[in-house]
């Protein structure tokens, strides 16, 4: 027999370096509070059902509550020899109250215990992610309201396409982040399921009351299959998938802000708090924090792919491979929360160069679709109108003349249907204002969407 809590079967003590390789206490101690919460609920159930004497349950409860206070004060010390947070807590409890601590593990396995800890850990933190998303959405809506009529180029293939408003652009990301919010909300439901009571994999012979434990821990549901309860990491994969999609959205917007802050674009300027300088070039103002968010996206993608790969060939039920589920979750959580906070501050603090944005739409031929649509309203088939305007654009590029600068006679030579009223249609403002179809960039639409989105935020 060795000195491990599970050591009855073993005769040889493992070398310290072997223990260190197998230990998870270096990272799963982040679940210390959740481990104590789960144990308190479990021992309450053991006492109430008579599985252990109530006096023993009371002693264990007092010991666990003392450990909670010690944890809050930063006084608990964990060891590699006890390998994980569960055995460390049991060892600390035994040191506190003696052998009666061994009764706590009645009708429980580390398999359902660790699953419960991880469920609780995410259950406690998902609301924080949703709140951070809501804060970012609030900034987006506020800025969209201010810039509902701020005209800028819209792009496809990174080429000027049609004029839009900066407010319309911001609300596109609002929609993406709303879907992120809804995904995390849905994952919260899948996280709100209690595994405890499944024991190692097959349930237990003791007359446990899983409903009581669920009520104590605030779980809405209970796993109905003990094998599934200890094997399931779908909720963790959902969280990482949601996190990866969220970081993709942040990264796409970060990329645009980085480009737009360059000398060549000069659409925006990031605030000093979210920029850095160069150690050699005095003029530099680098968008480091936007770049960091773009870079950290790969880190979260890696967390998702890592856990997907870990889980892809694991037979039921628990296997030691599943110890690798926690670090990617902990890291992804910290990464997305930090990124959301930085991004919210960065958007609040940036300066929009409205004049420069508007100027960028004046000689870029992004009003070509307006002229084609104009001809279509005059009875010219759209495909023919498209060809006519394409030829005018080519001519304008060669002569450095915008469509709205071409004489009426020149336009009429290409299409006799064109009249003087065409010039009113060719301004960027007109192009924006005419896009009143549902979801379009018209200022009136943007303001309606702002009102709708404000209501959506209030419903969070």
UniProtKB/Swiss-Prot annotation:
Family statement: Belongs to the lyase 1 family. Argininosuccinate lyase subfamily.
Reactions catalysed: 2-(N(omega)-L-arginino)succinate = fumarate + L-arginine
Name of this chain's protein: Argininosuccinate lyase
TM region positions: none
Gene Ontology MF, one: argininosuccinate lyase activity
NCBIfam families registered for this protein in UniProt: argH (TIGR00838)
Coiled coil: none
SUPFAM superfamilies xref list: L-aspartase-like
Record EC number: 4.3.2.1
Pfam families reported for this sequence: ASL_C2 (PF14698), Lyase_1 (PF00206)
Record-linked InterPro entries: Arg_succ_lyase_C (IPR029419), Argininosuccinate_lyase (IPR009049), Fumarase/histidase_N (IPR024083), Fumarate_lyase_CS (IPR020557), Fumarate_lyase_fam (IPR000362), Fumarate_lyase_N (IPR022761), L-Aspartase-like (IPR008948)
Compartments where found: Cytoplasm
GO biological process: arginine biosynthetic process via ornithine; L-arginine biosynthetic process
GO CC terms of this entry: cytosol
Main location: cytoplasm
